[in-house]
Amino acid sequence: ALSVMSSFNDFDGIPVSGNKWLLTDILRNELGFKGFVVSDYNAINEMVKHRVAADGKEAAELALNAGLNMDMVDGDYYKYAEELVKEGRVSEKQIDRLCREVLIIKSKLGLLDDPFRYGGEGRWDKETCLPEYMEASRKVARSSMVLLKNQNDILPLKENARIALIGPAADSRSEMLGTWNAFVSSKNAVSF
């Protein structure tokens, strides 16, 4: 993996986004992870709600010192990183390391040469929605399903059986994508 996302939950009372033991000692030092860690949506600032940080500045300090490379959305790194370095609460060496780890991955992916490499008109369909990738997606979906209960042996359906899908999203391909789907076109939704 080139990137890992920290989760919202805590481990032993410390939110993962500010947990140095998990992000640095275990992930990097013990497991040898060489990529970068990104926070989940607003997870750094959520440490204030967890009551382990008094405010966004302290939350940013915890996350930076824990080894969390990238702040998704809440902006606490942007707002406070320079100030935290000036105050000596986060070392410049730590900031350099966190930035370097992100830039190494961006370089490996060719994003320093072409930052729009994986975006732009038609590139998504042409480069990522290839038939072999779509088939791999179907295979993953099929093999990851688990039937927890099969009351009255209703499954598998008999060949001549019919089912009804009812509700406002019953015939909506875009609903198969769910939330947080970025820029995926519903025509590329994988179903079987």
Residue spans for each PLM region:
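Glycoside hydrolase catalytic-domain context in secreted enzymes
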Residues: 1-192
